[in-house]
A protein has these predicted regions:
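Glycine-rich phosphate-binding loop and adjoining helix at the ATP-binding site
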Residues: 58-60, 64-155, 283-295
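ATP-binding/phosphotransfer module of carbohydrate and carboxylate kinases, centering on a glycine-rich
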Residues: 2-55, 62-80, 84, 207-337
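Short glycine-rich anion-binding loops that position phosphate/pyrophosphate groups of nucleotides
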Residues: 96-98, 162-164, 278-279
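Short, acidic, Ser/Thr-enriched surface-loop or helix-capping motifs
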Residues: 45, 101, 170
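Short glycine-aspartate micro-motif
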Residues: 29-33, 88-92, 156-160, 166-168
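Glycine/GP-enriched mid-protein hinge/lid loop-to-helix segment characteristic of carbohydrate kinases
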Residues: 53, 125, 129-236
Length: 337
């Protein structure tokens, strides 16, 4: 865990001082996460340095066996790149979808509708290492809770509006979870009773059909050919082409503001952390907040803080692997009888 540096003698009696340095590569892990239609993986050390990366495009029509093979092919090359002498802590996965953490299964993901009850135990056996799972937003929020100590007090709502729409919530530093795996499905709640559009999830009138990037892309592409569907690439295109001034985005913003207001009225978090390429446009951000305040109790407005994160925020890399590092350190540091 540590190694000795230079010996320094200050001229006084006694043993000379020896500098001790942290061995940053003592423990490494792999984080796997989703960006639009891509699966990405990174090998990182306990300090958080990314040592190697891998990426693959995935089909929305893939099935359980396809996902298992893709994950093994994505992760194994990174395991082989661990530094000499390093211990491998395991793999942290952060996906969009519903997880049963007791059975260690991905129950359903709108992005991969053909996958049902995917077993992460099987993946763990294939990789011969520990595998931990979480939703993308849970992992991001866990990272924020580690990096921002004041988030540990009161309620924190993390809301994502991008290719899809979702949310997660923490109270006093603890992320709220559900044993069956269904919780905070913000993108799959109807905000317009007249909307009868069928969503990818199978429901009718979901918020995502009105505001998610995947639903807006066909109409945007009619006016702006070449609009990217990759969320990281979309932000620059969106800002440079001033898409936020169009009626399509303003309508979507109203729908998202109503969703946020409903969650706020139920949870009353002290802070609302926003992760969205759409809200990087200052005019759209201001419009969203005005719509939000119109739909929430005036006496609560002084109690909420809005915080914007850059859409490229990759906190899930660290949030999904923190427990792996903790587990490995405990094994090394606790004396075994």
């Amino acid at each position: 865990m540590v190694y000795e540096g230079d010996i320094w003698n200050n001229g006084k009696k006694g043993r000379p001082e020896i500098a001790l340095h942290m061995n940053e590569n003592f423990l490494v892990a792999v984080a796997v996460y989703v960006v639009s239609k891509q699966l990405k993986a990174v090998l990182l050390n306990i300090k958080g340095d990314v040592l190697a990366e891998n990426m693959v495009n995935v089909s929305s029509q893939m099935e359980n066996e396809d996902l298992l093979g893709i994950l093994v092919e994505l992760i194994e090359p990174l395991k082989q790149k661990k530094p000499v002498g390093a211990m491998f802590a395991g793999v942290g996965l952060s996906f969009f979808g519903n997880f049963n953490k007791i059975r260690q299964e991905l129950i359903f993901s709108m992005r991969w509708p053909n996958i049902k009850n995917f077993s992460f135990k099987q993946l763990s056996d294939s990789l011969a290492c520990e595998v931990l799972i979480s939703t993308s937003l849970e992992a991001k929020l866990n990272d924020l809770l580690l990096d921002e100590p004041h988030y540990g007090s009161g309620g924190t709502l993390l809301y994502h509006w991008g290719y899809g729409i979702g949310a997660t919530y923490a109270m006093n530093g603890v992320v709220v979870e559900s044993t069956p795996g269904y919780i905070m499905e913000a993108g799959h709640v109807a905000v317009d009773l007249n909307n009868e559009t069928k969503c990818r999830c199978g429901n009718i009138g979901c918020l995502e059909t009105e505001a998610a990037l995947w639903a807006l892309l066909p109409d945007l592409a009619k006016v702006f050919p070449g609009v990217p569907e990759n969320e990281d690439e979309f932000k620059e295109f969106y800002l440079s082409h001033h898409l936020g001034s169009g009626e399509l985005i303003l309508h979507a913003t109203k729908a998202v503001a109503l969703s946020l207001a409903s969650l706020y009225q139920i949870l009353h978090p002290e802070r609302v952390v926003l992760l969205s390429p759409f809200l990087m446009d200052e005019a759209v951000y201001d419009f969203m907040k005005r719509q939000f305040y119109m739909r929430t109790s005036p006496y609560t407005h002084g109690d909420v803080e809005f915080i914007r994160l850059e859409p490229e925020f990759r906190g899930e890399i660290y949030g999904s692997t923190a427990q792996l590092f903790k587990n490995s350190l405990q094994k090394e540091l606790i004396v075994q009888d």
